[in-house]
Amino acid sequence: MFYKRDVSEYRQMAQGVRIKTLVFGEKTLLTEFRLEAGSTLPRHAHEHEQTGYLVSGSIQLTIGDQTYDAGPGDCWCIPGNVEHEGKTLADSVAIEVFSPVRKDYLPEAKR
């Protein structure tokens, strides 16, 4: 499966947080997050391992009890079932991979 970049199909996850599923396979799912300065992702946990790469901007991530300020080029790995949250310090773009596939992030036709 190949992905050709376009700006359609973003879904609003929270105020100032949009997500787009880029591509997925049997075991992984790749997403792009577009985050507006001041937006937050509340503390939560899920079964999926989550790895991320900050393309641009600045975010503050709390994973478990550790807090990190991430800038462009920084990466993270969140083990499954570990609580985490995020605060967007500047308009940002992040790429994240989830394993196993998050069914709630699949395009409507694939759920």
Feature annotation, model-predicted:
Residues G80-D104:
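Ligand-binding loop in jelly-roll beta-barrel domains
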Residues V55-S56, G71-P72, A90:
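A cytosolic small-molecule/anion-sensing beta-strand core signal
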Residues T31-A45:
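Conserved short histidine dyad/triad with adjacent acidic residue
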Residues H48-I59, G64:
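Glycine- and acidic-residue-biased ligand/ion/polar-headgroup-sensing regions
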Residues T31, I63, I95, D104-E108:
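Anionic, Ser/Thr-rich low-complexity intrinsically disordered regions
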Residues M1-K27, P107-R111:
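A short, N-terminal "cap"/entry segment at the start of jelly-roll beta-barrel domains
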Residues D65-G80:
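Short acidic-glycine-tyrosine-enriched beta hairpin
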